[in-house]
Amino acid sequence: MIFIDNRQNKFDVTEELTKKLEEVISFVLKEEKVKEDCEVSLVFVDNEEIRGINNETRGIDKTTDVLSFPMIDYPEDKVYKDVYLEHEFDKCYFDGDELILGDIVLSLERTKEQSIEFNHSFEREACYLVTHSVLHLLGYDHMEEEEKARMRGREEELLGKLNITRES
């Protein structure tokens, strides 16, 4: 289940946008071989709120585009499909029958700024950031160059399969 919570009032959150982002989340989960019913929360905020969350949770007093809060601890250099296709999850990761993957906090204000900066659509930028964040919920990271290359490659592959291009 995908929960969407709009906590900002600077941008209209259309049904078209929420459906597209739900489609992106579902597609990434399917492509990453997530078989369980799962729970992902997507929270829309403005720059001020994401800056506060970034400072509170990471000690970085700076606006960012998206924050990911995975609920599952993955072994180092492993992602969901590397580990959990053959193993079961501990019950603490479930809410009833749903696997709790985590939360995505997306600044729609920063998304708009970046879409202008990178010269593509707001929808494309939002889809990219949500794809990026879902991959974080599944254990991907970009702290080391090798991890970064793996994650960036996977992002582009997934967006390509969804036909979401820089021209979109």
Curated annotation (Swiss-Prot):
It holds the Pfam family YbeY. One of its GO terms (cellular component) is cytoplasm. Coiled coil: none annotated. PROSITE patterns: UPF0054 (PS01306). Disulfide bonds: none annotated. Its cofactor is Zn(2+). Keywords: Cytoplasm, Endonuclease, Hydrolase, Metal-binding, Nuclease, Ribosome biogenesis, rRNA processing, Zinc. Its EC number is 3.1.-.-. It is an enzyme of class 3 (hydrolase). Single strand-specific metallo-endoribonuclease involved in late-stage 70S ribosome quality control and in maturation of the 3' terminus of the 16S rRNA. This is Endoribonuclease YbeY. It comes from Clostridium perfringens (strain SM101 / Type A).
